Amino acid sequence: DYFAGRYKRNVPKANGNFGYMLTAVNRPSINREAYVQVIDFDFKPSAPSRFYGWVSQSKIKDDSQDVSGIGARLVATRGFSDQLFVLGALNYLDEDFDINDMGYLEENNKISLGGFLQYINPIKNENSKVSQTIFRVNGGHNRSTEGYSSGIGLNTELEFFMRDNSYISLKCDCTVMRGKNFTETRNFVDAPFIESLAKYNLQLAYYSPRTNKIRPYVKFGLGTDGYRSDDP
């Protein structure tokens, strides 16, 4: 048995909206019930600013357990100008937060903090071969609710848009700080300490000038990744 219902209301004075959703699953064949409640919101206090997210509670009940968990996601964005955009996000999913019965991927025992920055720089000098450059950086840090850190990751990208409509991209997907892969050892006390080694994935791409029929391009990449298992 499955049920899902949602209510949403606009709040003109706050330039936003909020909503509530209930999802319920009942599986008599295995005597299992699952409920998920979610309150979501999206507000724009000013033209360049936005604040949105959700808070959720899950409840699982069967012959072996009767537990509830809490999850939340908060995101704030601001466009400081036509050139600069910044985003910050915070996620919290406690140990007992379980939405797998709802048909989603299971994810819990996690606290994450992330950010995104984009800077667009148009080149006004018409003699320059570059018409515009864009720099993006996206970073994040994950930590289990027990305090295990999975490290700090950083993705950067620098793009060059040429006046002949060709395009050059430089990317780096890197691990700034190593940490424990606690997803692999979750809920297993005797599991080994699995450390995520430093990761560096570098990529260079060139796209030829765009035409109506075909656009050749070439990419070069170099990467390293891996794990190491030690006792805690």
Spans of model-derived segments:
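Conserved catalytic-core segments centered on acid/base and nucleophilic motifs
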Residues: D40-D42, A76-T77
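A conserved hydrophobic secondary-structure block that centers on an alpha-helix together
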Residues: D1-R32, D40
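Short, solvent-exposed loop/edge-beta patches enriched in aromatic
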Residues: R9-A14, P45, F160-D164, R210
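Exposed, low-structure sequence patches enriched in small/polar residues
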Residues: A34, R50, W54-P232
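An acidic- and aromatic-residue-enriched active-site/binding cleft used to recognize and process polar
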Residues: N10-P12, T23-R27, K44-S46, S56-S58, ...
